[in-house]
C-alpha cells in the first residue's frame, strides 16, 4: 500500500511475538540506508523508518486479543542468509492456518480493505498479509472481528515485505503474491526505493508455485512501466489476461477509497498480472 511518511525496517527477518506498546514501533534501532548498504551490499527497495502510531482503545483491545493467534512480528537478522535466496526461517503455513490450502502473500496490506474482501470471496484460500504499520494491522484485525468469519483464513505479519518474502517464505510455496498500490516514489533519485524492482520480481517468481500468480496494481503510469519492464524481464513469468487465462486464485479486487480518489483525479488503474510457467 502507498504510505504517507518515511519509515525503516532492517532487512533480514525472523518471527517473534510483538511486545511493543500501542505507540511503539517494535522494529528496533533504525539505521540509515547507506549504512545498511555497506553491510548488505545493496540498498533495500523499501528503506523506510517505522513511524509511531497510537491505537484507539478498541484497536488496542482487539490487538491484545487477536494478535497472539493471528499475528507475527518480523525481527531483524544482523546478516543476510549465506544461502542467498534460501529462507532463514520459513513459515509453516499448514501449521499456522491449521489446514492444507493455497497460500497468497499480500505485501503492503494497509488497513486490509482488499485483504479481507478477497479472503471472504475465496474461503478456500489462505492469505498472509504483510504490513509495517501497526495501526493498519490493528484496523484489519478489527475488520476481521466485525466480519465474524466462520473460519479466519487471514494471518498477519508486521515487517518489511521483501524481507518476509526472502527470509520467511519457502521456494515454490505460494499460489499468489499481491502488491496493490505501492508507493511510486516518483522522483528519479528515489526510484531505487520502489518496492517492485527486477530483484524483487526474481524473488517473487522463486517463491511462486508453477502456475502461481503475481498481481500488481498501480495508478502511477511511470511506475506501471517500471513494473511491466521488471515483470516481463523475468523468464519464469508470463503476463496474462485474466479474462482469457485460467488462474488458480482470484484477481478481482474491491475498489478502495484511495482508488476512488485516484479515479476521480483522472488516474487510470493499471492491473498487471503474471503467471509462473510450469
Curated annotation (Swiss-Prot):
Belongs to the class I-like SAM-binding methyltransferase superfamily. TrmB family. HAMAP family: tRNA_methyltr_TrmB (MF_01057). Residues 1-42 are annotated as: Disordered. The gene is trmB. PROSITE patterns: SAM_MT_TRMB (PS51625). It comes from Mycobacterium ulcerans (strain Agy99). The active site is at 183. Its EC number is 2.1.1.33. This is tRNA (guanine-N(7)-)-methyltransferase. One of its GO terms (cellular component) is tRNA methyltransferase complex.
